[in-house]
Structures are given as C-alpha cells and as structure tokens.
Amino acid sequence: MALTIDELKIQIQSDEHRQLELKKTTGELKDGMHSACAFLNTEGGWLIFGVAPKSLKIQGQQVTDNTQREIAQALSYMEPQVDVRVEYIDIPDRPDHKVIAMHFDGWAWGMVPYTYHGCPYYKVESTTKEMPRDMYEERLRRS
C-alpha cells in the first residue's frame, strides 16, 4: 500500500478528517501516536508527518537514523503491538526532505482495544480523544 507523492497530494486535498492526521514534523510524534492509537480503535487512517496541517503545504523533513529510531520506539508503546509499514516519500523539489506516512487498519468487534502508553484513544470526527472507561471496558469484555 505504498503511497506516491501524487497520491499524497490527492489524499491531503480535503484537509484533516476522521481518517487523516497531518503533523508538520516528528517533533509532534507523541501527539501523532495518540492519533495512531485512535485510528486503530476506530475506522483506521493515515498519519502523515511533513505536511503543515493549516496550509496543507508539503514540506517534508530530514530523515536520519535517529528519526527512524524515534518512530520505532514510539510505535513500541502501542499495546497490543502493531506491525505498521512506515513509508518515506521523496519530495521532488526538496531532495533532502521526505514525508513520513503510516497507515493504520481500523478496529473490529472482537478485537482487543489498543492503548498508547497505557491509555486508549479514539476518533470523534477529526478530533482525537481519550476513550471513556466504560467504552474501553465494554470492548475488553467483547474481545
């Protein structure tokens, strides 16, 4: 499910929504992981770093070994563990910058709800919220 730069441009045309979260850089990695957890507990979606949320401008960022380690470390705090492919998309007019994209599959009844650092999240429209305890416990009972 590799995303090209042209597909990315189409994807972000409609601004952030229930299945799309944009972050300017991985400096917002923790907030991004809250959204990733919420995607896993709702309908799934894309988490994209390197796109300004307000202007929708594709800026990208420099990606180092340290950047990749930070992403891997952040993903390791997800419970249960997730196997997500992290895509690094080249930006034609900025050769030293990449957009970082991750797709998370949605939740289905019977699955254990996901947590990030022990806290479950879910999506309400384009907003990421902590999952209410009763909703979390109901999902645990049905898993």
Positions of predicted regions on the chain:
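Conserved N-terminal catalytic/coupling substructures associated with nucleotide/phosphate chemistry
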Residues: 1-143
